[in-house]
């Protein structure tokens, strides 16, 4: 599990491309190396990846076909930067919201509105069916960052970013058309799905022969 509080950004230093498979190497910040071992989990733009090799600050990770298809990690080139967070420990403060590191879809940066001390970014979700889980003032994970949803339309939503978030993460450098990874808040998803099932069951019961309104 992860907290959605990005611990740093890491530069992609090499890519070994194979059919439907990729190994990439990032240069992790020094403060994230303490106790790091092969097999550990590190989120890259919110996507949980497993450490396969450690060579100083250069840490290797394998990406499967499904990861490359669903997330924006397959778009990365050498020299790009990713948000990184090590897996949470039981004693860690949950400064954001609990996140699994399982990306559900991507979203495209559709509009950027900048003022002196904050920035509003609008996103268009690739899988529009997931919009029912994106609620005003609800949680959402964007490239591994725990954020609060601002306004919501049938096809888009926005978040408001303070200077600290813009400085510490890659969102401050995103341009129109850029793809970001999206993780829906699992509690929100569970509530929405449960309500839908209850309403569907009630409607089916009402439509049974002999059922009175």
Curated annotation (Swiss-Prot):
Per the record, the pathway is:
Cofactor biosynthesis; riboflavin biosynthesis; riboflavin from 2-hydroxy-3-oxobutyl phosphate and 5-amino-6-(D-ribitylamino)uracil: step 2/2
Report residues binding 2,4-dihydroxypteridine 2: 48-50, 62-67, 101-103, 137
Stated EC number for the protein is: 2.5.1.9
Recorded catalytic reaction(s): these are:
2 6,7-dimethyl-8-(1-D-ribityl)lumazine + H(+) = 5-amino-6-(D-ribitylamino)uracil + riboflavin
Q: What Pfam families would the database entry show?
A: Lum_binding
Q: Name one GO biological process term.
A: riboflavin biosynthetic process
InterPro entries in UniProt: ATP_synth_asu-like_sf (IPR023366), Lumazine-bd (IPR001783), Lumazine-bd_dom (IPR026017), Riboflavin_synthase-like_b-brl (IPR017938)
Which branch of life, at top level? Bacteria
GO annotation, cellular component aspect: cytosol
| Keywords linked to the UniProt accession | Repeat, Riboflavin biosynthesis, Transferase
Q: Where does 2,4-dihydroxypteridine 1 bind?
A: 4-6, 146-148, 160-165
GO terms (molecular function) for this protein are: riboflavin synthase activity
Q: Where are the Lumazine-binding repeats?
A: 1-97, 98-195
Q: How does it assemble?
A: Homotrimer. Unlike in B.subtilis, does not interact with 6,7-dimethyl-8-ribityllumazine synthase.
Role description: Catalyzes the dismutation of two molecules of 6,7-dimethyl-8-ribityllumazine, resulting in the formation of riboflavin and 5-amino-6-(D-ribitylamino)uracil.
| Protein known as | Riboflavin synthase
Q: Which organism is it from?
A: Escherichia coli (strain K12)
